[in-house]
Curated annotation (Swiss-Prot):
InterPro entries referenced in this protein's UniProt entry, alphabetically: Ribosomal_bL35m
Keyword Transferase: no
Location of this chain's protein in the cell: Mitochondrion
Keyword DNA-binding appears in the UniProt entry: no
Protein's name in the database: Large ribosomal subunit protein bL35m
Annotated gene: mrpl-35
Keywords: Mitochondrion, Ribonucleoprotein, Ribosomal protein, Transit peptide
Disulfide bonds listed in the record: none
Annotated transmembrane regions: none
Length: 158
C-alpha cells in the first residue's frame, strides 16, 4: 500500500506530453524501415514513402530529387540553384533495398505517354551486364544473336 506522500510524489512527477515534430524527410516513422504485410490481402504492401520520394526506371535504377532543393534558394549561389534541380541516382545497395520494399507490380517496367523519364530508361555505354540481388542476369532488351562489333556498328540505343 502506498502512503499519501508516496502517491503525491508519483503524481507530481508526471511530465508534459511529448510534442511530435511534423513528418518531413528526416522524420521517417519506424514502420517504414521494414517490409509491411497486409493480412487482408495476404501479401506485402509497398512502402508509400518510397513511391512518394523515388522513381524506378525501367532498367532497375532508382532516382530521387536533390534533398533540400527548395530550402532557402535565395541564399544559394547560381551553380547550386542549377544543379539542385537535377535528379540523383541511388547506389546499388539502395536500389536493392528499395526493390525489396516494393511489390512486383511496381518492379515491372512502366510505359507512360509523354514520360519525362523515357530518355533515362535505357543505359548507354555500359558494357557490364545488369545483375539482380540474387546474381541472375537481367536483360534490358531482346537478345540478338551477333557479335559485339557488328551490333556496335549497326545498332544504337537512341
Amino acid at each position: 500500500m502506498l502512503g499519501k506522500t508516496a502517491l503525491s510524489t508519483l503524481c507530481a512527477s508526471r511530465q508534459a506530453p511529448i510534442t511530435l515534430a511534423a513528418r518531413g524527410i528526416a522524420n521517417i516513422p519506424a514502420h517504414e524501415y521494414h517490409i509491411r504485410f497486409d493480412q487482408k490481402v495476404g501479401r506485402k504492401r509497398p512502402a508509400q514513402d518510397v513511391l512518394d520520394r523515388f522513381k524506378r526506371l525501367n532498367n532497375g535504377m532508382w532516382i530521387h530529387a536533390h534533398p533540400g532543393r527548395h530550402k532557402l534558394r535565395y541564399m544559394k549561389d547560381e551553380t547550386w540553384q542549377k544543379t539542385s534541380l537535377y535528379y540523383e541516382t541511388c547506389t546499388k545497395e539502395q536500389c536493392e533495398i528499395l526493390d525489396k520494399l516494393m511489390t512486383p507490380y511496381w518492379l515491372r517496367p512502366k510505359h507512360y505517354p509523354n514520360d519525362p523519364y523515357s530518355a533515362y530508361n535505357v543505359r548507354h555505354n555500359v558494357t557490364s551486364p545488369r545483375v539482380d540481388d540474387r546474381g541472375n542476369f537481367v536483360r534490358e532488351r531482346k537478345k540478338v544473336l551477333m557479335d559485339d562489333s557488328t551490333s556496335k556498328r549497326f545498332f544504337k540505343d537512341c
